[in-house]
Regions:
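Heptad-repeat coiled-coil signal-transmission/dimerization helices
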Residues: 2, 36, 77, 218, ...
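EAL-family c-di-GMP phosphodiesterase catalytic domain
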Residues: 23-26, 53, 67, 137, ...
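Cyclic nucleotide signaling catalytic output domains
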Residues: 12, 23, 38-42, 49, ...
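Bacterial c-di-GMP phosphodiesterase EAL domain
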Residues: 103-104, 110-227, 237-240, 253-254, ...
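A short pre-motif secondary-structure segment
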Residues: 4-5, 10-14, 55
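Short beta-strand edge/capping elements of PAS-family sensory modules
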Residues: 74-75, 93, 143-146, 179, ...
Length: 359
């Protein structure tokens, strides 16, 4: 809908998730501001009905000018991003032109610093993989393991930076697509070097869902290293899959044709959950740790986890529970019919592949 107010010489593009950008070449400031107002109004007029209720959509829009606010394209996007957050602070359905005296400014400049560090890490081989096992509840035998990415911290020699610090920035800037491909390539090489090792699961970002060449890259990499496709498991989050349902269905379909297994990660945190299971034909669902951490103490979570296990069993899917940290939770998951478990009770992430139980 917002794209309908854009003229032919203007570029309307999706940045990812629910974020879009419009590039206006050779316009005056007042023209950009008029367009911003039109976009905000157009979004507000979109009819949207969910579960029998009429909902009102809102948009926050930020405006930045070149060269007034930035020296290059990356900085221009960053300044427009700051202005968008300034608009959010002002209320719903509004827009703002970038101003330098904002707390959001400092936040975004920090994001730019992280983006530079991510670029440096990709260019200088400063990413590392750790592995954590995923085990059968019965007998605690390893079924497969998950690859977890870390970044070398050059400011603190010997230390690694956890993904929570850099992945959100990488998702925002799009560099996460390169990280995803690095992880896939490195995992396939590890699998090739250890023919008897267990399958490895890799996480795919929401950004990579829209990459139409990703499945071919996976197929080519597996073929190049002569690794059977069923040794690679691809995980994508429920929230990302539902937000980009068409792309998720396409990716799951092509991965299944290749022979890779697919896992729907962080299940239960999205707004759809059960309703979309039939549309997203993943082999496995991984229940979000939010529902598992205090499972033995939370009766509501127990009902939810049991229901997931029952529905998954009926659909022929495997269920994984993450963040399993005590015996009481493990026994409860066993009673609920959960197939596989992951967590510190069984092992901790390690550079060793395959990881060792209790390691």
């Amino acid at each position: 809908e917002a794209g309908t107010v854009v003229r032919r010489n203007e570029i309307f593009a999706r940045l990812g998730g629910d974020e879009f950008a419009i590039l206006l070449p050779g316009v005056q400031a007042n023209e950009a501001e008029i367009l911003a107002e039109r976009v905000v109004r157009a979004v507000a007029q979109i009819p949207f009905r969910f579960e029998g209720r009429n909902l009102r959509l809102t948009a926050s829009l930020g405006v930045a000018y070149l060269p007034d606010h930035a020296a290059d394209a990356d900085e221009l996007v960053a300044k427009a991003d700051i202005a968008m957050y300034q608009a959010k602070e002002a209320g719903k359905s509004t827009w703002r032109v970038y101003r330098a005296d904002s707390e959001a400014n400092a936040m975004t400049m920090e994001r730019l610093t992280w983006n530079n560090r991510i670029s440096h890490a990709l260019e200088n081989d400063l990413l590392r993989l750790h592995f954590q096992g995923i085990y059968h509840v019965a007998g605690r035998r390893m079924a497969h393991c998950e690859a977890l990415v870390r970044m070398v911290d050059e400011r603190n020699p010997g230390q690694l930076i956890m993904p929570a610090h850099f992945i959100p920035v990488a998702e925002k800037t799009g560099r996460v697509v390169e990280i995803d491909r690095w992880v896939i390539g490195e995992v396939v090489r590890r699998l090739a070097r250890s023919a008897e090792g267990p399958a490895i699961a890799v996480n795919i970002s929401a950004r990579s869902l829209g990459d139409a060449t990703l499945s071919q890259y996976i197929a080519d990499t597996l073929k190049q290293h002569r690794v059977p496709p069923d040794r690679l498991i691809v995980e994508l989050t429920e929230t990302a899959a539902v937000a980009d349902l068409h792309d998720a269905q396409r990716l799951i379909g092509t991965l299944s044709q290749i022979g890779c297994r697919v896992c729907l990660d962080d299940f239960g945190t999205g707004f759809s959950s059960f309703a979309y299971l039939k549309h997203l034909r993943a082999d496995t669902i991984k229940i979000d740790g939010l529902f598992i951490r205090d499972l033995h103490l939370d009766a509501d979570n127990q009902v939810f986890v049991r229901a997931i296990a029952n529905v998954a069993k009926g659909l022929g899917k495997t269920v994984v529970a993450e963040y399993v940290e005590n015996e009481k939770t493990l026994k409860m998951l066993d009673a609920f019919g959960v197939n596989l478990v992951q967590g510190y009770l069984l092992d901790v992430p390690s550079v060793v592949y395959p990881p060792c139980a209790g390691g």
